Amino acid sequence: MATTISTQRGQVYIGELPQDFLRITPTQQQQQVQLDAQAAQQLQYGGSLGTVGRLSITVVQAKLAKNYGMTRMDPYCRVRLGYAVYETPTAHNGAKNPRWNKVIQCTVPPGVGSFYLEIFDERAFSMDDRIAWTHVTIPEGLREGSVVDEWYSLSDRQGDDKEGMINLVMSFANMPAGMHMSPPVVLMPTVYQQGVGYIPIAGVPTAYSPGMVPMGMPAAPTVTPQEAPCSEEDLKALQDMFPNLDREVIRTVIEAQQGNKDAAINSLLQMTEEL
């Protein structure tokens, strides 16, 4: 029971302090901002959705129907799979025949069987202009270990399937049950002024109110599958065997087969037969 005693300066309150003493209760808006930030970070790494596997997409090149604008276009690709967005580097002066040879590693959430690909022309003094797009269904054969090398039709202003074609090489690696990619422990900076802060790694803008102390997000330790390294000797040997295939395409196939050289040769033979 609390008691009071008298001193020269007045009465002093003695006893147990309440648990919420000097604590600022966050408003509903502040709590929602914090929950949104955590959800965005989980979605960035597929933590809340789980992962059924990893899709490797090699964006090789495109043959476009038209060069939009007065100068040669600087195209780049944007891939949307689930909640994640990936981009290739810009093919400067690529015009109608840009080449990227960019390998994109995508985590595939459960229930996702396709992805959306867009090609943009990078502009210096205005918004980037979308040139073409396509909707790609992930082939069922990928889950059986095969590699798909296909040309996909592009659509936009010229009409459906009339904007040219894009060459994609895809492979799929199954992820064992219970394994998923998650971010490391992230400690948010303490902000005491109204403003906009950026969450490390995820890069999601979040507003903090005065007195609000953001909380860290501890992540459960997970075990990630390790792939066999792709040696330069194996890569060079397969490149000599398949001189018509791009070096990055061969590297992607070796990584998809987890360093198994015989399986990679079978996949590459299948690709050359389809060409």
Curated annotation (Swiss-Prot):
Assembly, per entry: Interacts with ATG8 family proteins (via AIM motifs), and ubiquitin (via CUE domain). Found in a complex with TOM1; interacts (via N-terminus) with TOM1 (via GAT domain); the interactions leads to TOM1-recruitment to endosomes and inhibition of TOLLIP binding to PtdIns(3)P.
GO terms, molecular function: ubiquitin binding; ubiquitin conjugating enzyme binding
SMART domains per UniProt: C2 (SM00239), CUE (SM00546)
Domain C2: 35-152
Function: Component of the signaling pathway of IL-1 and Toll-like receptors. Inhibits cell activation by microbial products. Connects the ubiquitin pathway to autophagy by functioning as a ubiquitin-ATG8 family adapter and thus mediating autophagic clearance of ubiquitin conjugates. The TOLLIP-dependent selective autophagy pathway plays an important role in clearance of cytotoxic polyQ proteins aggregates. In a complex with TOM1, recruits ubiquitin-conjugated proteins onto early endosomes. Binds to phosphatidylinositol 3-phosphate (PtdIns(3)P).
Naturally occurring in which organism (per UniProt): Esox lucius
Free-text domain note: Both ATG8-interaction motifs (AIM1 and AIM2) are required for the association with ATG8 family proteins.
Subcellular location: Cytoplasm; Endosome; Early endosome
GO cellular component, one term: early endosome
Chain ranges for the short sequence motif AIM1 as given in the UniProt record: 133-136
Motif (AIM2) on chain: 151-154
Family of this protein: Belongs to the tollip family.
UniProt GO BP: autophagy; inflammatory response; innate immune response; phosphorylation; ubiquitin-dependent protein catabolic process
Main location: cytoplasm
Source species, domain of life: Eukaryota
Domain CUE: 230-273
Pfam families assigned: C2, CUE
Keywords: Autophagy, Cytoplasm, Endosome, Immunity, Inflammatory response, Innate immunity, Repeat
Stated name of the protein: Toll-interacting protein
Residue pairs linked by disulfide bridges in the UniProt entry: none
